[in-house]
Structures are given as C-alpha cells and as structure tokens.
Amino acid sequence: MAHTEGVERDVSAALTFDVIDGTEVALLFAVSAAPIEQETLEVTIGDRDVPVEETRDRFGNRMHLLKDLPEGTVRLRYKATGVGQAEPPTVEPTDAASHLRPSRYCEVDEFTKVAAEVVGDRTGMAAVHAVVAWVHQHLDYVPGSSTVTDSARSTYVARQGVCRDYAHLTSTLLRAGGIPSRCVSAYAPGLSPMDFHLAVEALVDEQWVVVDATHLAPRASMVRIATGQDAADTAFMTTLAGRLKLTGIRVNAVANPGLPEENWEQTVQLR
C-alpha cells in the first residue's frame, strides 16, 4: 500500500457559462471529504453575487445548486488550499452487490466474454491489474475523440478516448469479471492537459483501491470530488432547468512538496 502522509494539495476550478432566465444547475467540483486549510467559492453574474445551496447527493458527494438564475454570464471560482489526506473510503455492506451492476455508460452484461478472456484465472489485485493493463494497451488517448454519449461499448469499438472512456471501459470489464467497481472524479496533480479527471475504484479484500488506465497522473496525490457508478453520477455540471452554454473552464491542481512517484503495480487508496 502506498503511503502519502505529509502530502498536501492545492486545487482550483473556474467555470464560465451563459444561461437563460430561470436556469437551474447542479455542480460537482468541491473537494469531497479531505481536510482543507482554506476553501473559497465565488459565484457571480455581472457584479451580483449568486446564492449557492450546498447539499449531498445519494452518493454523499458535495453538490452545489444554483437555482432560478437570471439571464447572463455566470462566473464561478472555487479554490481549496492545504488539502490533506481523507480517511480511507468506507466499504458499505451493499457495495459488492450494487457495484457489480450495469449502469448508464457501463454495459456490463455485454462484456462477460471479453472480461473472461482478459482476466483469465486471476483473482483479486492480479485480476484488477490485468484489466487496467489491457485497457492501457488497447486504447489510444485522443483528446476530442469522444462525446458525452459514448459508453464502454463504443469505446471498446473505437479503441480510443479520454479519461472518462478509459474509466468506463475499465469499470465495465472489472464488473463483468466479478470485481465490484465504481468511477470517481478527481483533481489530479500532474495531469496534462489539466482538467477534471475520472478514475476507477475496485473493491478488493474489503477495501476500495484506485486504478487509472490512462497513466497520466500519480494516483496518490489525486483528490476525490465525486463518486458514482459512472460519469452520469460524477459529471461536474448538470442542467436541471433552462439552458446553458459552457464558455470557459480552467482547472488546476498541485501537490506539495511535489508529485509522488508512481508504481502502477502498487495498491493505492484515494485519500
């Protein structure tokens, strides 16, 4: 198990989007559970502050709601500094069953044969590593190559995608191979180009371990934002009413005193 004591992260997100009158938005951008030295959030339209309601969704994620927005350009600025290590993710009695099931972007039932070929007779972390290695070797990371409607099925056919596509295919193969799995959005120091990131957690030996077939950022310095079955549960922005157009996004994440070394065969928990 990787040890990350002493690692602190500074993260930030800036979103700009145009809305029509009456628009309502649900946002997932805030650090989920890790201790934070200082956290700020500013949301404005023009020179007016926008009221923000914070709640928790069914997965326990920190969700921010913007309701009945007037027409205009919304500017959101979020910053969290001195982000420490959260407690290890808890394992609930229902996790094993619920995280083997298909979900919107993970067509588990269609991948039973493929998963059997990839996993073979491996079990536990050996099976997890086999799936992650297969996805890493068989997909090309190509920014702009997929859309929000792409799923594990279309990614398997296209053999290319971005982090969400890697995560969906990885999680689907794990579930199809009998390993409970879920997706997790995160701030990822070291990621290039910098953006919100989507990785995967697998339930092995009664603990959630994080894996990432993109190999684009060290797992030990990632900061959890949201947890769910797939991107339908972890998307950073969901329009609840009205209409919006995202016109700008800027994400930043750094690890202090520096990025940890990554060993992709090592067991890591997202803290």
Describe the residue ranges of each PLM region.
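Secondary-structure boundary elements
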Residues: 81, 86, 90, 96-161, ...
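Short, charged, solvent-exposed linker or helix-capping segments at domain edges/interfaces
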Residues: 27, 88-94, 212
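Hydrophobic/aromatic-rich core segments of domains that either
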Residues: 133, 165-247
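Glycine-rich loops and low-complexity Gly/Arg-rich segments
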Residues: 38-42, 52-53, 67-68, 102-105, ...
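Intrinsically disordered, low-complexity N-terminal segments that are enriched in acidic
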Residues: 1-85
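Short low-complexity stretches enriched in small and charged residues
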Residues: 29-38, 87-89, 154-160, 164-167, ...
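Low-complexity, flexible helical/coil segments
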Residues: 48-55, 61-66, 110-119, 217-223, ...
